[in-house]
């Protein structure tokens, strides 16, 4: 019956199967730990809708219509592998400032992952002709454009077929997703429970005791565990913490606010080229530029949100080139326990966006786009993060104020990354896994053995 509590017991429970959660589950399971991985969504990889426009709507929070109170669109997929199903497969090494300002050195884990997953730039012939024109135009104007590192390998796919549609799920198989680490975790003995929504963490005398939630939205369940790792994302993790009595979670967030600057060329545009193959980072002015365009069906929706007249640009979609602006924003706003998200743009954020927009327009014109065709899309939030910040709400070891309760996802970023986030999250997760295996889990085993011995006396 739906009202009967289902109970489980394990050593470590990991909540969320995105890049953070799947990595922790994989590392710990491979080391022989009893691990249970809980995922709110389902595994859609073999679903007929995977990689389609309709599928992306079906498995996204609020079916793709999740907005901040200020109107920023947020895409938050509920599925195994999390947001890596819908990312562009871009990789960036962890920023140097993590080490310089916060004492967190992720270099070894990042380089290990680069080697393991063969993260590298795409061959020149796969960068895309329009993307190369944008890169050359940017270089001619003084920007340091270059090919970007990718979680994407043509050799993995029977037929390399990447374009704007990659953001809906990779059907050709070239793009790495966290599902692969999840599969490896399960193969190593991890128990995977899908459609398992976690509501709260069990806290007993300042010590974690497990988690509670509902299966399929109605069946109560409880998992008892000695260690809990929350990896439910920049929005999901603070919501769970708030419901568990940790009120400061979600006070302030970063979002890497993003817009596309579109222009129409006489030649083919970027729609049928791999996304974000080239780009540049302007550290001085605080933004990243790359080549990106919304998928065919999403484009008119985003254009209409900008204004009804912009819908007419859809008929020139094949010749449209998109330059993405990702702003390194200041922490502001909040995620509330009622699932409301507020993310106002600060004055500095707006200045950075304005500078990037001017530069992007110049690049598009230099690349041959009609100046009169250029427009800027509606603002959207791409990387909800910094909601459980390292140094404020979690320690250097990612532990919260509750003993053996850890957070490992974009929530722990102490400030906006302003870069592709996945490699940094994986690096944090490998670092945390090593820390748990070296100390915490050994200590818990000793403590459990001692308690059992005392009880038998």
Mark where each language-model region is.
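Short hydrophobic beta-strand that contains or immediately precedes a catalytic carboxylate
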Residues: 37-38, 192-193, 406-408
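A glycine-rich dinucleotide-binding beta-alpha-beta segment and adjacent secondary-structure elements
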Residues: 158-169, 199-204, 352-416, 422-426
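Conserved redox-cofactor binding core of oxidoreductases
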Residues: 105-199, 377-387
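N-terminal glycine-rich phosphate/pyrophosphate-binding loop and immediately adjacent elements
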Residues: 2-100, 213, 248-264, 431
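Hydrophobic anchor at the start of a short beta-strand
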Residues: 33-35, 145, 228
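Residue-level detector of alpha-helix initiation sites
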Residues: 18-19, 235, 412
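FAD cofactor-binding and catalytic pocket of flavoenzymes
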Residues: 69, 83, 246-358, 362, ...
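Glycine-rich loop(s) and the adjacent beta-strand/alpha-helix scaffold that form part
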Residues: 30, 41-45, 200-201, 211-279, ...
């Amino acid at each position: 019956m739906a009202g009967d509590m289902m109970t489980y017991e394990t050593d470590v429970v990991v909540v969320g199967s995105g890049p953070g959660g799947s990595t922790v589950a994989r590392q710990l399971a491979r080391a022989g730990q009893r691990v249970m991985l809980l995922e709110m969504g389902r595994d859609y990889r073999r679903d007929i809708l995977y990689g389609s426009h309709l599928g992306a709507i079906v498995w996204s929070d609020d079916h793709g219509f999740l907005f901040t109170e200020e109107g920023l669109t947020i895409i938050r997929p509920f599925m195994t592998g999390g947001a890596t199903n819908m990312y562009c497969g871009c990789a960036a090494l962890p920023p140097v400032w993590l080490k310089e300002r916060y004492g967190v050195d992720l270099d070894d884990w990042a380089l290990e992952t680069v080697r393991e997953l063969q993260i590298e730039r795409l061959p020149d012939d796969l960068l895309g002709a329009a993307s190369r024109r944008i890169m050359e135009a940017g270089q001619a104007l003084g920007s340091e454009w270059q090919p970007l590192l990718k979680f994407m390998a043509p050799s993995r796919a029977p037929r390399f077929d990447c374009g704007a549609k990659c953001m809906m799920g990779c059907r050709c198989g070239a793009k790495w997703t966290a599902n692969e680490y999840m599969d490896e975790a399960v193969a190593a003995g991890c128990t995977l429970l899908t459609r398992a929504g976690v509501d709260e963490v069990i806290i007993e005398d300042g010590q974690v005791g497990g988690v509670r939630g509902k299966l399929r939205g109605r069946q109560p369940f409880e998992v008892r565990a000695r260690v809990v790792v929350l990896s439910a994302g920049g929005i999901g993790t603070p919501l769970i913490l708030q419901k568990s009595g940790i009120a400061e979670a979600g006070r302030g967030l970063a979002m890497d606010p993003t817009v596309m600057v579109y222009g129409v060329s006489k030649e083919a545009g970027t729609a049928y080229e791999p996304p974000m193959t080239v780009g540049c980072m302007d550290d001085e002015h605080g933004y990243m530029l790359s080549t990106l365009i919304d998928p065919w069906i999403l484009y008119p929706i985003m254009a209409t949100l900008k204004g009804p007249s912009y819908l007419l640009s859809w008929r020139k979609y094949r010749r449209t080139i998109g330059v993405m602006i990702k702003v390194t924003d200041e922490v502001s706003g909040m995620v509330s326990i009622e699932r409301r998200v507020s993310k106002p743009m600060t004055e500095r954020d707006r200045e950075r966006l304005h500078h990037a927009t001017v530069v992007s327009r110049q690049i598009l014109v230099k690349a041959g786009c009609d100046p009169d065709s250029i427009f800027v899309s509606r603002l959207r939030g791409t990387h909800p993060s910094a909601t459980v910040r390292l140094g404020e709400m979690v320690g250097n070891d990612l532990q919260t104020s509750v003993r053996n309760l850890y957070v490992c996802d974009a929530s722990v970023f102490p400030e906006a990354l302003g870069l592709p986030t996945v490699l940094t999250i994986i690096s944090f997760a490998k670092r945390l896994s090593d820390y748990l295996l070296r100390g915490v889990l050994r200590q818990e085993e000793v403590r459990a053995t001692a308690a059992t011995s005392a009880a038998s006396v």
